[in-house]
Amino acid sequence: MRRRYLVTYDIADEKRLKKVFKVMKDYGDHLQFSVFLCDLNEIEKIRMEGAIRNFMNEKSDQVLIVDLGIATRQVDEEN
């Protein structure tokens, strides 16, 4: 079952920020700077979290993943 997630992050270093942004483009729709809407199954969510955390500095960076519930429709892939 696919669930919808709102993902937002604050990355202190610009180089890491660009890497996280590139990862997130593979998982969801870019809504605003550092904010994505993603429809993911459990495996995709775990992979996304791992990919993001590979580039994060736990002392200075933050990520927030909010579960918005069951995805009732696919996210528009053109955005």
Identify the function of each model-found stretch.
Residues 1-6, 12-79:
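Basic nucleic-acid-binding interfaces
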